[in-house]
A protein has these predicted regions:
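Conserved acetyl-CoA-binding loop-helix of GNAT-fold acetyltransferases
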Residues: 88-101, 124-128
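A short beta-loop-alpha structural element at the N-terminal edge
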Residues: 1-16
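Acetyl-CoA-dependent GNAT
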Residues: 31-85, 96-97
Length: 144
């Protein structure tokens, strides 16, 4: 297993993992037909890590600022996507832990994740990494 900063050439593999997550119905409100260019716009390479298993990218995680307002400069929203073949095998904890460490190096002081309430694996993963369940936001988005 290896965790490293993402490179632009990794994005096409990460996009496949992302679409796999979208097709699961529990990963995001995004539409599954996102293009590579749109994906590139979404992911800040400085704030993204990839997870390699047997020298192949099998997951990635990133965070973005939640707002451009000055008072929120150190607040980020986390996203993590794993290939279905490694879900439940403990890799996510290592990846998310490294992402939290990266966020601290970049002077972020608070991270949160927006997780569907029925994505229990993701909720448990985040709790193992120190995230706290704060509640359920209703009518925040709509599945297409």
């Amino acid at each position: 297993m290896n965790i490293k900063k993402i490179k632009k050439e990794d994005l096409s593999i990460c996009l496949k993992i992302y679409k796999e997550g979208l097709n699961s119905g529990i990963a995001s409100f995004q539409e599954p037909n996102i293009t590579l260019d749109e994906f590139y716009e979404k992911v800040d390479l400085e704030k993204c890590l990839t997870l390699e298993v047997n020298n192949k990218i099998k997951g990635y995680a990133f965070f973005n600022k939640v707002s451009n307002r000055y008072v929120y400069n150190g607040v980020g929203e986390v996203s993590i996507y794993l290939s279905k073949e490694i879900i439940g095998k403990g890799y996510g904890k290592y990846l998310l832990t490294e992402l939290v460490l990266l966020s601290e190096k970049l002077k972020f002081w608070s991270l949160h994740a927006m997780i569907f309430p029925y994505n229990l694996r993701s909720i448990k993963l985040h709790e193992k990494c120190g995230f706290k369940f704060l509640g359920i936001r209703e009518k925040i988005g709509k599945m297409t």
